[in-house]
Amino acid sequence: MIETNVSRRHHETFIQVIQSYYQLTKPRIIPLLLITTAGSMWIAAQGQVDPVLLLVTMAGGTLAAASAQTINCIYDRDIDYEMERTRHRPMPSGKVQVRDALIFAIALAVLSFTLLTVFANLLAASLALSGIIFYVLIYTHWLKRHSTQNIVIGGAAGAIPALVGWAAVTGTLSWSAWLIFAIVFLWTPPHFWALALMIRDDYAKVGIPMLPVVEGNAATVKQIWYYTLITVAATLLLVYPLHASGIVYAAIAISLGAVFIRKSWRLLHNPEDRPTARELFLYSISYMMLLCLGMVVDSLPLTHHLVNAAINQLHLIS
């Protein structure tokens, strides 16, 4: 009986350790990064992605993102302890020690680089590694605690997965790859500033100079409005002049963009309304995921066949 209880406690402890390391990686953030990788890969491969390459690239991207987020947790453990919503994370709660977390992060980065180098190419691996370095040194260490533009410049780190996906397929970076990077980069400020409006008091408490804290809600929603307009406009450049995507993607991008603009407009006229900020924040996630899904669907040979058949049918009718 005693041995059974001891075994159960050991099992529970092991599960708790696994859960703590899993939480270090901030797993809810990673799918949003991977969907941009997928969208980029499908366009680059013209709708015919090698399943093995897709799996490897997604795995490498997951490991790279997990490494960056783990180091972010190490660096931010002091401010995480001060905020109620983050106080129970593994680092501030003492569930994981700094040394162990750092070893874990390095192991993830090495595994990501190795996997992408061996099964994709060196360019994809180097881009993933640069994403980790940029996120840790430029955003976490330098910008986050010192500049209201932390999210703007730091958004480059979150846009790098799109480049990784394109590089994994082609071994190069075209104008289309850089445009997808730019779309994610421009989308980041409206997304994160909407969140910052919701939790402004938390950031103020720990001295993080997020735009709503330093310049106020009114100035922030104006910036959100401008970036939303530019983001939506940028999404259409994949259709013209780059011709990387077609009519199906265009219809999806216009529809999603119209809703994005409407929600941003509502926030512009209700800068103090947190439910409106929350609504925009949640929609921005759906917007990016559905936009990238639109890239995938539009690139498929079946989609091209159906569109061409529909156009031919219209010509016959006319």
Curated annotation (Swiss-Prot):
Q: Name one GO biological process term.
A: heme O biosynthetic process
Chief location of this protein? membrane
Task: Identify the pathway.
Answer: Porphyrin-containing compound metabolism; heme O biosynthesis; heme O from protoheme: step 1/1
Q: What is its EC number?
A: 2.5.1.141
Per the record, the domain of life is Bacteria
Q: Name one GO cellular component term.
A: plasma membrane
The record's keywords, sorted A to Z, are:
Cell inner membrane, Cell membrane, Heme biosynthesis, Membrane, Transferase, Transmembrane, Transmembrane helix
**Can you say where in the cell this protein is located?**
Cell inner membrane
Is Transferase one of the keywords?
A: yes
Span-the-membrane segments of this chain are: 29-49, 51-71, 102-122, 123-143, 151-171, 179-199, 219-239, 241-261, 280-300
Is Protein biosynthesis tagged as a keyword? no
For this protein, the record's Pfam families field holds: UbiA
Q: What would you give as a GO molecular function for this chain, any one? A: protoheme IX farnesyltransferase activity
User: What topology in the membrane does the UniProt record assign?
Assistant: Multi-pass membrane protein
Q: Which reaction does it catalyse?
A: heme b + (2E,6E)-farnesyl diphosphate + H2O = Fe(II)-heme o + diphosphate
Instruction: Return the similarity comment.
Output: Belongs to the UbiA prenyltransferase family. Protoheme IX farnesyltransferase subfamily.
Additional note from the record: Carbon 2 of the heme B porphyrin ring is defined according to the Fischer nomenclature.
Q: What does this protein do?
A: Converts heme B (protoheme IX) to heme O by substitution of the vinyl group on carbon 2 of heme B porphyrin ring with a hydroxyethyl farnesyl side group.
Q: What is this protein called?
A: Protoheme IX farnesyltransferase
